[in-house]
Amino acid sequence: MLSRIAENLYWIGRYIERAENTASLLDVNYHANVEAPVVPGAKGIVTEQWAPLLALTDDEGAFREHYDRADGRTVPEWLAFHPQNSSSIRASLARAREDARGLRDRISLEMWETLNRAYLELCFSTERVLEQDGLHEYCVAAREASHLFSGIAYATLPRDLGWYFLLAGQQLERVDNVLRLLQVREQQGVGLEPVARGLENHRGMALLKSVSAYEAFRKRHHVALEARRIAAFLLLDPDFPRSV
């Protein structure tokens, strides 16, 4: 297989997975902030947890060049579709589409149509995304586009080297995302005031939902959402498809 074809398939896998991961992070964080429990007496605890998302995506430096503060509007705008963010959902879908456009004879028509449709629907007309429930709907659409593309690829792409390069890109991006999540989650727990321990269950739930693992974890463990158990599940579980 030519190196250009292999590289493009690899990056298509990464970009599609990156768009899905970013959409999941935004959507889960949006709902987590809305539903965050009030902890009486917990001073100095920030209820809005938007800044950690920048650490997850390694975008904080670039973000600070355009915004003064990280909040529920600036971070979603940056991660979803800001034109200067090369890792945004919009940029990831656009790059995946561009790579796929040069491989029209190597991928199925259905794969191309799915990518092209996602690009047209999610990369334009984003003015109202940050209004009311627009962010949730946008993130759901991005995740569903990724799921649809992965399902069609699984059903239509021959199991030759091209398939394995596409899969390698997807899996490496997925592993990188899980490891970043666990690292930031560990940093959030360091030095946490005892009165704020009530937030631990809430944060654990958000972490698991960010990688679509909450239900799978609950079926395996009928106990409190302890950080150690969550980390072990996401790192070592042999049956969960998103574990490292």
Feature roles, as predicted:
Residues 1-244:
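Alpha-helical transmembrane segments and their helix-helix packing motifs
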